[in-house]
């Protein structure tokens, strides 16, 4: 993980930090920066100093993000070799082997419904906790954090939530665009449903993983299956048309999502499909009866702030129990290190889960 700090203790990597926040350190290196205006708008990249209303650690994260050099341009969709290099560069900062050596959680690889899954089990779980299952869907723009990276993120998630975690290593572009990843997530959910029952299941996803998690709810409903006990969406992508206000207004203020027009891996994932299709942009779906109680997380510097608040409003309009946590000055996917803000998000999320998972 590229943090600019030496001698970082292994446990500081995971303490009080959301999975998407950790991943954002790597993810932000894979999003291009530009000094040009957004297409069809007058927006230009801006930079304001971090506010005094957040912790020093969070301020430092924003300052470092503002100073990072622009990475190489995003490859064209047909440039398979270019995408492989892009993914390798984006994955490199995550300290996978260091995370996997941290004791306290056993991780094993399984095949479920034809998909690869990493089962992470904290040591010393009670029998009641062993009866619960957390289906975790990683982010990374539909292209990053597969393989051992997904395994490491599974371990972190299990440690944070103190539960059995099933992390889907879903297929990704360039070889496997939509709907391959969503189909993998659905296959794993269906398999877990037989073993645990819906009342004992939690589904979560961050960023692109939040997109897949939300789309999964629609697919579960459409298949006539029972929805999980609860859903957590961390800075989710819900509208692939990039129509939200914050996508333009926060251009230059979010150190993670710096791609000026937002195509890149989105275009690769779409593979020519209509971005307004609900399985691609869940915001445009019929949300009624599809979603369990849902907890959404975003920040005031997250370029997907609009995606998150619009999804929250749409869920409320569909009479779904939905809660929204907005963190001051937080960019996409969190502050990426051990900050009071990251700890507050995790604490609030765990508190929200009480009484909702397992469902009474």
Identify the role of each PLM range:
Residues 331-339:
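Catalytic histidine-centered segment of alpha/beta-hydrolase-like enzymes
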Residues 296-298:
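Short beta-strand/loop motif that positions the catalytic acidic residue
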Residues 130-139:
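Short beta-strand element of the alpha/beta-hydrolase
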Residues 218-273:
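Hydrolase active-site cap/lid region
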Residues 33-125:
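A glycine/proline-hinged amphipathic helix-loop "lid/cap" segment
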Residues 2-20:
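N-terminal secretory signal peptides and thylakoid transit peptides that target proteins
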Residues 340-360:
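Catalytic active-site module of serine/aspartate enzymes centered on a nucleophile-bearing elbow/loop
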Residues 146-147, 154, 166-200, 339-341:
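Catalytic nucleophile-loop/oxyanion-hole region of alpha/beta-hydrolase
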């Amino acid at each position: 993980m590229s943090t600019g700090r030496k001698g970082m203790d292994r446990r500081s990597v995971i303490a009080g930090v959301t999975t998407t926040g950790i991943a954002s350190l790597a993810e932000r290196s894979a999003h291009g920066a530009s000094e040009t205006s957004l297409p069809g708008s007058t927006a230009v990249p801006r930079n304001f100093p971090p506010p005094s209303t957040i912790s020093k650690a969070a301020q430092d994260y924003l300052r470092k993000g503002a100073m990072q050099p622009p990475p190489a341009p995003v490859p064209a969709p047909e440039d398979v070799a270019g995408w492989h290099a892009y993914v390798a560069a984006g994955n490199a900062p995550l300290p996978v082997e260091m995370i996997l050596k941290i004791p306290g959680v056993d991780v094993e690889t399984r095949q479920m419904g034809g998909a690869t899954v990493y089962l992470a089990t904290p040591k010393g779980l009670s029998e009641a906790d062993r009866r619960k299952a957390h289906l975790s869907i990683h982010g990374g723009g539909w292209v990053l954090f597969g393989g051992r990276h997904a395994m490491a993120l599974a371990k972190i998630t299990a440690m944070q939530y103190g539960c059995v975690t099933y992390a889907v290593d879903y297929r990704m572009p360039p070889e496997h665009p939509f709907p391959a990843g969503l189909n993998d997530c659905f296959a794993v959910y269906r398999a877990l449903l037989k073993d645990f029952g819906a009342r004992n299941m939690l589904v979560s996803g961050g960023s692109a993983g939040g997109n897949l998690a939300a789309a999964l709810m629609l697919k579960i409903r459409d298949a006539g299956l029972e929805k999980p006990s609860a859903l957590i969406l961390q800075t989710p992508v819900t509208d692939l048309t990039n129509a939200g206000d914050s996508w333009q207004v926060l251009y230059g203020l979010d150190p993670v999502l710096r791609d000026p027009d937002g195509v890149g891996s989105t275009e690769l994932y779409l593979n020519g499909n209509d971005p307004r299709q609900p399985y691609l942009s869940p915001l445009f779906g019929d949300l009624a009866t599809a979603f369990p109680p849902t907890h959404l997380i975003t920040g005031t510097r997250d370029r997907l702030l609009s995606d998150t608040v619009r999804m929250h409003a749409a869920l409320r309009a569909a009479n779904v129990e939905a809660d929204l946590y907005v963190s001051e000055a937080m960019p996409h996917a969190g502050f990426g290190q051990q900050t009071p803000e990251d700890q507050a998000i995790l604490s609030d999320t765990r508190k929200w889960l009480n009484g909702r998972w397992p469902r009474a």
